[in-house]
Amino acid sequence: LALEIQIDAARKINPNVQLGDSVIIPIDIQKFGRIAAQTAKQVVIQGIREAERGAAYDNYASKSQELLTGTVLRVDPTGDMFVRIGQGGEQHDAMLRLSEQIPGQTYQPGDPIRVYVIDVHRSPRGPMVQVSRTHPNVVRRLFELETPEIAEGLVEIRNIAREPGSRSKIAVRAVREDVDPVGACVGPRGGRVGAVVEELHGEKIDIVVWSEEPCEYV
């Protein structure tokens, strides 16, 4: 518990204290009754838990719109899935609702899974993390991981149209004329786009050069 104290009173405890310093005031706990001691203990524990929940919220709020790797914990009878995300002491459970799952894809507890963080909000039990497999940015983040030219800013993904589980079409453009944006995303022997297709369980990926004329995509 932090309180402000007058400098004169502080120097009665520690003669060497200066303005702005902290002073520890010893307390004789024998003067407190059992109930008061238990109450103080609960206040401290509650403060620690609130601080932990706040830190967990800040951690996952900073990961909003990121692609994370997790492990399937369980699947409810409703079809909603719970996924353990994070590493070490920063692990947390996220919800992958049935509406955010790709039709036809099934998982068992213990299976690894990549999910996209779409929302994080506070709750009395800690941060509620909502994740998705169907969001168009799942495709975007996968190509960012597989394509160095995107990570380096040489190629941009300008638009994505997606039918989750069926096909996606992405429009890309190069920042420099000597860079082939489609070839960069396809990769040598189709390795880069192939890795994305594999992660999406066979979803077809069409890659086209971006144009300001929508009719060119038809």
Predicted features, each with a name:
Residues 1-218:
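RNA-contacting regions in translation and RNA-metabolism proteins
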